[in-house]
Regions:
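Nucleotide-activated sugar donor-binding and catalytic core shared by glycosyltransferases
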Residues: 1-139
């Protein structure tokens, strides 16, 4: 998958820990991959929320991160062939690329060039859940 990111001109922040961080760092060090990748420790909820809301795009294997990306209208590439949050693909900003480096490279090009798919916010993702819950409870 790192091969699929090798031509990126955007800085890449990888929130990894332990063995995953070491494996990725070793792979990056053993290739001609530009030094645009920065590996950081996993962040607090608020810090991670800030990073994801202000990112040019997100690459993840997490359905929950894809949800955050859709809510913030940030392009998201999921390194999987399925998601438990299909609305992020059908309505939102998420695209599934599986484990194919070429598909990742094409999606990254769209992300960086600003040609990402048009997306919306899925039904009931309007931030008004508390109001709806109170309305149901008061009946």
């Amino acid at each position: 998958m790192i091969r699929g990111m090798k031509d990126s001109t955007m800085p890449i922040i990888a929130s990894l820990r332990g063995k995953a961080a070491k494996v990725v760092a070793d792979i990056v060090a053993s290739t001609s991959f530009p030094s645009i990748m920065k590996i950081i420790e996993p962040q607090s909820y608020l810090d991670f929320g800030y990073i994801t809301a202000n990112a040019c795009g997100i690459i993840t294997d997490s359905g929950n991160v894809a949800e955050e990306a859709t809510f913030n209208q940030v392009p998201c590439i999921t390194l999987n062939s399925y998601t438990e949050h299909i609305e992020t693909v059908k309505v939102g900003t998420n695209v599934l690329v599986g484990e194919d480096p070429d598909s990742l490279s094409i999606a990254l090009e769209d992300m960086v060039n600003g040609t990402w798919k048009k997306a919306g916010i899925p039904d009931r993702w309007d931030g008004r859940s508390a109001e709806r819950i109170l309305q149901i409870l008061s009946c």
